[in-house]
Amino acid sequence: MKISRATTLAIALMGASAWAASYTESLLALHKTLVEADSTTKAEAPSTQALKTYLETNFTVELKTVEGSRQNVYAYPGSGRAARVLLTSHIDTVPPYIPYSRAGDEIRGRGASDAKGSVAAQITAVEALLASGEVGEGDVALLYVVGEESGGEGMRAANGLGLAWDAVIFGEPTENSLVRAHKGVLGFNITADGVAGHSGYPEYGRSAIDLLIGALERLLDVPLPSTEEFGNTTLNIGVIEGGIASNVIAESAAGRASIRAATEDLEGIKGILSKAVAEVTPEYVDLVFTGQGLPVSLDYDIEGFNTTVVNYYTDVPQLNGTHKRYLYGPGSILVAHSADEKITVSDLELAVEGYKKLILESLKK
C-alpha cells in the first residue's frame, strides 16, 4: 500500500499529540479572536489591534503604517529586528463579514480559512518553538499585512522595513500542502457608452447594457492560453453595474473582471481580449486593463509534504528579496470568499506542526 507524504507527516506528528493538546486551547482562542475581529479590506484596524494586544506578551511589536489608519504588524522575540526566517500572511478579508461560529471540529466565519487560520497557526508554531528552546532571538519573525485582497499594498509597504531573510513562509489556505507555483493575475474594467431614452422607443436610444452584455458574452467565449503546469487561463466577471430604471434605456454600464493567467504572456492575453471586444462592438465599449502579476514559482525542497499548484494569486511576489519562498497553510481555497467559509480544528493543529517543520528545516539550510 502506497502512503502519501502528507499521510506520513500526519502519522509522524501523532507522536506530538500530547504537546499538541497543550497548545490547542490557545491556538483556537487566538483563531477565534482574529475571526471575530472584522477586518474587511480597507478597514483592518480591529484585527491589527487584536494581533498587537496578543503578540505583546511574547514579542516586540512594531506597527507600520500603510496608509491612513491601516497598519502592518511586524513582531519578533527579543530586541533584534533581523531574523533568518519570516512567517507572514494577511489579516484583511473579503466582504461581507461573517461572524465566528463553531460546531464540533468545524469553525466557520469570514477569514476562518483565508487567512486567519494561517496567522493563528504560524504564531502558535513560533510560540511552541520558543517555549521548547528550539528557536530564539534572531531566528524567526512575524509579519502580518493589510491589503492582500485589494492588490498587495500592505506587502509592498513591508519592503520599507529594510530587512532581508533567508526564507519566508507565506500563509494561505493550501490544505497543508507545499505549493510549487501559482497562477498569474490580470484585471480589467469594461465600460459601455449608451444614449438614454424611453424604453418604449429603443430605436431612438442606445442601450449601454446591451452593448456590455454582447462584449462580455464574447469575452467568455474566446479561447485563452493554457499550459501543462497551470491548465487553463480563466476569466471571472465579478461586478456588473448599469442603468437607472427598468423603463429607461441605459446610458452607461460597466463591469470588472479578474483573469487567472496560466502563462507569462500577459500582453498576448490583453491582445486576445481587446480584439474580441473590437470584433463585437467596435464603438462605444472601452476595455482598460488594471493590476497584473506573472505566474510565480515557489520553493518546495523540504521533505514530508504533499505539493500542489494553485490557481489563485498571492502576496509572494510583492515582497522583494532573494529569500526562499514557501507557500503553505491550513484550510481550503474552495471555501474562501464564500458564504460557507470554514476550517477544521484538526487542520489548524496539523498546520502548526507543518509550520514548525518548515521553520526548523529552513534554519538548517
Locations of the language-model features?
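Acidic/His- and Gly-rich active-site-bordering loop/insert found
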Residues: 2-4, 19-112, 130-136, 327
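Metal-dependent amide/peptide-bond hydrolase catalytic core
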Residues: 21-25, 29-32, 40, 62-66, ...
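Short amphipathic alpha-helical segments
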Residues: 71, 105, 140, 251-256
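Short coil/turn motifs at secondary-structure junctions
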Residues: 92-94, 147-149, 195, 262-264
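Residue-level marker for buried hydrophobic side chains located in beta-strands
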Residues: 85-87, 168-169, 195
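Acidic/histidine-rich catalytic neighborhood of metal-dependent amide-processing enzymes
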Residues: 120-187, 227-228
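Structural motif corresponding to alpha-helix initiation and N-cap regions
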Residues: 69-70, 152, 312-313
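N-terminal signal peptide c-region/cleavage motif recognized by signal peptidases
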Residues: 15-17
